[in-house]
Amino acid sequence: MKIQKTECAGETFLSLASPSGLTLVLTPLGAGIREVLYHGVPMTLSPATDADYLHDHVFFYGKTIGPIAGRIDRGRFPGLESEFALPVNPKTGVTLHSESLDYAFHRFGFKIEEKEDGTRVVFSSVIPACLEYPATLEVEVSYFLSETEPAFTLSYFARPNRVAPIHLTNHVYWNLGGKDEAKEATLQILADRVVSYDERLLPKEKVSVEGSPLDLREGKKVEDVADCFDATPLGGIDHGFYVNERSLAHPTYFLTSGDFVLSIATTAKAFQVYSYNFPVEGSRFSSGVTNAKRIAVTSEPVLDSTTMKEDFLFSPAHPFHTETLFRFATKKE
């Protein structure tokens, strides 16, 4: 494993290059993924420069989202309304990705563990309680890059000092091959159910994918599916898909674009998939891809956002923990 450290604007970037051909570039800021390359070809949609990556406050490219990822009505939690009250967007009355508390710009400590079968980078921090979120969290985000296979595992662990709502995920955007044609990618998700949303984009209930554009069990072109929701407030795909199997041994998410294939397996309940519906004018990317709708998709491992109280609450004896395995290949492999 070849490991390199570089600096930009006082921030550290760690590049791990596996003999398998997979390279993972990480940063302690947001315990995030700066870039993923396979045989030197970009697999992610990443800002053109390190400085752009560090200062982006819109898309959170590859960074950790927490303490609560997703949309929450008025920032309140059932049963804990008087204690936990996250910042709210005054225009919508909704909390998105914890707003100003978001971990995407928290600086984590890190250590590198080199082993025979691969290298692990562990980002960790004790994040103190505050008025809006009165719980202290011990957070650990780890990436394990295999020495022999083009794959890496992302693990999230968070232990609160009291009962608290927790929901951590990663906001990486996939653009396999770094081409404009990525919107032609085929997406397959082995999920029988998906989340429906209200006019404020808050999750309502689980519904069957049967007979809907969101039935991706056999695979469909991303653009074709996203265009079905273009006239809605979602603007495209922005849905939680409940996977049929929660296991690292059984991938449930498959993205194919050009010569490349990404398969993902997770212990989380669902994937939140977003088809880059609202590009920001002037955005530039390291791969040179054109800034346009549908050029990338996310695959955020998430919890059950329709039953927030039961699934979001964790404790010292019952910490938050998810694992997700990302594996890359070419069609020839």
Regions found by a protein language model. Name each.
Residues 1-333:
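An exposed, glycine/acidic-rich loop-and-rim segment of catalytic or binding clefts
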